Structure formats: C-alpha cells, structure tokens
Amino acid sequence: MEFEIKISIIVPVYKVERELNRCVQSLLRQTYGNIEVILVDDGSPDCCPEMCDEFARQDNRVKIVHKRNGGLSDARNAGLKVASGEYVLYVDSDDYIDIDSCERFMEARNNENVDIIVGNAVMEKKDGNELINHSEIQEGITYTSKEFVEQAIKANQWYA
C-alpha cells in the first residue's frame, strides 16, 4: 500500500497517566506508514504533559500541543489547527486501536461514496476481557447519510 496520504491522529490528553502509553503505542505501531500523532495536553495536572513531551522526543511523528484546560471539543479543535494530514482520526487517550486500523480506513476510503468511516468500539474489563461490543453498524456496508443516522438512532449509538 502506498503511504502518500497523511493521516493526522488527534488525541486529547487529560488525567490518563495509566492509559496513555498503551494508547500512543497503538498509534505509533500502525502498519500504515504516513501518520502524525497529535497529543493535545488539555492542562492535565498529572504527569501527562511530561509523558507527551517524552513521546515527541522519541518519535518525530508526534506533535504536542500544551494548552489550558478547555474540555474535549476544545482539545480536538486545538489538534485540528496543527494537523497536516488529509484525513483526521480522533482517538480518546484512554483507548487504543488495532495495529492495522489506519490501513483499513485508507482501504475503505477508496469507495468513492464514502464521507465518513466509523470504527468499532469494544469495552474491556480491567482483566482484559471483552465486556460489550458497541457496533451495531455492519462492517463493509455503505449507508446513505439518512440510513446511517437511522441505524445509529436504532442502535442508540452516539459518540463524542
């Protein structure tokens, strides 16, 4: 697969010392090669700002934005301002993604009818066992905008 098109992965960071390393490592290990990871420190009072700086020192694909706390949407918007990718992926800092997620997204975007790509979400117990698989949207199906909204309403699936 060609890696010409860059994906910007924006990660708002706030009070996630325990989860941040797993999240960032899942992003840096992507099989799709042309990514930038934008960690937006949203004024986190713990060690997250220093952790973000260390990730940037270790990998030049990592950009850091340090800002005053403004909430999730404000942090995402701050990341979007410095993003240089043609596509944007938002990942919450207490989450992680499969190693081939970006590659699969890029393959899915080859369908000329695609405006948005929705990934699956699985809740995990502290012991690592799967708790709930959140996706009722069927894989590999192209929905119209109206069909997607109807499906999301039926499944009670709305994500920030």
Question: Which residues make up each language-model segment?
Answer:
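N-proximal low-complexity "stem/linker" segments adjacent to membrane-targeting elements
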Residues: 1-29
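Acidic helix N-cap motif at the loop->helix transition within catalytic regions
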Residues: 21, 46-54, 66, 78, ...
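Structural signature of beta-strand start/N-cap positions in the alpha/beta core
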Residues: 8, 34-36, 60-63, 115
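Short beta-strand/loop segment that forms part of the nucleotide-sugar
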Residues: 34-43, 63-68, 92-93
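A conserved acidic beta->alpha catalytic loop
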Residues: 26, 41-50
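Donor-binding/catalytic cores of nucleotide-activated saccharide
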Residues: 93-160
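Short aromatic/hydrophobic "clamp" motif used to bind/position activated sugar donors
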Residues: 88
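Glycine-rich, basic loop-to-helix element that forms the pyrophosphate-binding segment
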Residues: 67-83
